[in-house]
A protein has these predicted regions:
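Bacterial N-terminal signal peptides that target proteins for export
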Residues: 7-27
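Short, surface-exposed loop and linker segments with low hydrophobicity and enrichment for Pro/Ser/Thr
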Residues: 42-51, 103-116, 149-168
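Long, charged/polar, surface-exposed segments that mediate recognition or autoinhibition
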Residues: 90-148
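Polar/charged alpha-helical tracts
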Residues: 22, 42, 70, 74, ...
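C-terminal segment of classical bacterial N-terminal signal peptides
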Residues: 31-40
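Non-cytosolic coordination micro-motifs
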Residues: 55-58, 63, 122-180
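N-terminal secretory signal peptides
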Residues: 44-103
Length: 180
């Protein structure tokens, strides 16, 4: 009995260390892409842009729409539109995972979910490949259709957005933790 408990505890520690390793790797690998970023609009993105926004898009961070609205407002100025339950910010010249980000969106108060998303100048397959190469996170296709969604184990989704890709992480505002 004690051996089984020890094995489960050891396995849990291994999973935690693996997650911590992936986050550290993501931070290290996203940082080189920051050197080529050009700021647009009112200000340049903070040096932490690739880490903060990248990890949120990968569903590796908690989502807080107020925090990300303020962060994006500071980096890019006023949103250029409010549509579909989201504030849209122009982010031309920004790069994450070696891919150009054209727009970033964060939910407004009308949305039933907290989410952050980005429109990427590239195909969903190219974005999926870039993320896998940069941080080791893999996406699986929901089905074999041409416009199939791709989803990571953490819940991040890559979809078609006209001729570009859109990546997002969404969490319901109404989910509450279960009893332990």
């Amino acid at each position: 009995m004690a051996s089984t408990h020890h094995q489960r505890r050891h396995a849990h520690q291994g999973v935690c260390l693996n997650i911590i390793h992936r986050i550290a790797l993501a931070c290290a690998l996203l940082a080189p892409g920051l050197a080529g970023m050009n700021g647009v609009a009112n200000a340049a993105p903070a040096a932490t842009f690739g880490i903060e926004v990248g990890n949120a898009l990968l569903c590796l961070n908690q989502l807080n729409s107020k925090y990300f609205y303020d962060y994006l407002f500071e980096a890019f100025g006023k949103p250029y539109k409010t549509e579909g339950g989201a504030y849209w910010f122009k982010a031309a010249g920004s790069n994450i995972w070696g891919m150009e980000i054209t727009d970033i969106l964060v939910n407004d108060s009308s949305s039933p979910a907290d989410f952050i998303g980005a429109v990427v100048n590239g195909t969903p397959q190219a974005l999926s490949d870039a993320i896998t190469k940069s941080v080791g996170i893999r996406y699986t296709l929901d089905d074999a259709g041409k416009y199939s969604l791709r989803q990571s184990q953490a819940g991040s989704v890559i979809a078609y957005a006209d001729t570009k890709a859109k990546i997002y992480c969404a969490k319901s505002k109404y989910l509450v933790p279960g009893k332990q």
